Amino acid sequence: MSYQKPKGTNDILPGTSEKWQFVEETARLIFKDYQYQEIRTPIFEHYEVISRSVGDTTDIVSKEMYDFYDKGDRHVTLRPEGTAPIVRAFVENKLYGPEYTKPYKTYYMGPMFRYERPQAGRLRQFHQIGVEAFGSENPALDVEIMAMALDFFKQLGIQQIKLVINSLGDKETRATYRQALIDYLEPHMAELSEDSQRRLHENPLRVLDSKDKKDKVIVAEAPSILDYLNEPSKAHFEAVTDMLDLLEIPYEIDSNMVRGLDYYTHTIFEIMSEAPKMGAQSTICAGGRYNGLVEELGGPDTPGFGFGMGIERVLLTMEAEEVVIPALSELDAYVVGIGSDTNVAALQLVQSIRNFGFSADRDYMNRKPKAQFKTADKLQAKLVLTIGENELNEGIVNVKSMATREEKAFPLSAIHDSFDEVYDEMMTKMIEE
């Protein structure tokens, strides 16, 4: 019987995993520059953590959660997104305490799970990179985090992107706008999709996020939330746009953008790919401010701002823009052993080379010298060390630069005791030539 991976999942194999490593390591370097530290949470959470934070009426909670009762009859769910688990950890571990620097800056990476129809860039197990910052209402933090996301894409080599922003205001703004939206949508009730009819009185802002074509036509004429911002909300959003202008960061404002999660307040944003090959899957990063979420999960009133991005979607964007990913797995040395008597000596050589901090490999398949040299060439080894029975008896090894084809014999002891000097000598000759 043959087994296959579950629908909507992927095996990330060598050759592809290097691309993932490049994205992840680039993110770590950027986040370090901005003083964000990593946090790791369980891949499953209590159901209420997600339902209370993300919102009962969202598609995620109502349709897409992998939730179940465990053997102790506890209702748990595989995490569908990263922010709620981070907020839960922030509250549970009292990271809001005075001993911690504010804003408390953190990032995460890992798998998320949603039961949805698999398609390009949308899987049932997908992988997310995200950041969260807690403790500051300063609009400058909103701008810093958006700038950090753009910086990350720039470092990856992604160029064809745009920043789209909106404000959802505070609770007072939301309440005023909610009623205005209901008043506008109610006359169109019969024309709305089934989902939007259900949401109209539960959470009317979610109607703005509908993917239904008829809904989109109706929503296009809906009142703008920006016309309902109270003075504090208006001041916050104006400060954000002023600082984006000051930093010369281009952006567009989309007053119908609401995001698919209920916890957002004030600034929200999306970074979209404009690469022609990306098609409908154009949003590659999204986030915003959530000033009530920490309190919702049992913590003190603490503002927050963050974003999330799917690694799969980022890689699709890089592919669409034909970004060349630099080789991460360079091989410094390959040892060719000729004859069965050299088996132990070849093992000693690769271990000695690795002990000096260099990458090394050798043949374990008893292949002929020609096949071993072919492997060294395929692996793009910088140096090839050859040892046969004659060399073993003489206590030497032949070292060849694959770039210059220059070859030199060294004592075996030189490899074991000072390979770094051997490497430098051979590589220096290559540079000189």
From Swiss-Prot:
GO molecular function, one term: transferase activity
Pfam families for this protein: HGTP_anticodon, tRNA-synt_His
Record carries keyword ATP-binding: yes
One GO CC annotation: cytoplasm
InterPro entries: aa-tRNA-synth_II, aa-tRNA-synth_II/BPL/LPL, Anticodon-bd, Anticodon-bd_dom_sf, His-tRNA-ligase, HisRS-like_core, HisRS/HisZ, HisRS_anticodon
GO biological process: histidyl-tRNA aminoacylation
EC number: 6.1.1.21
Compartmental location: Cytoplasm
Keywords: Aminoacyl-tRNA synthetase, ATP-binding, Cytoplasm, Ligase, Nucleotide-binding, Protein biosynthesis
Root EC class: ligase
Annotated HAMAP family: His_tRNA_synth (MF_00127)
Subunit structure: Homodimer.
Family label: Belongs to the class-II aminoacyl-tRNA synthetase family.
Protein name: Histidine--tRNA ligase
Gene: hisS
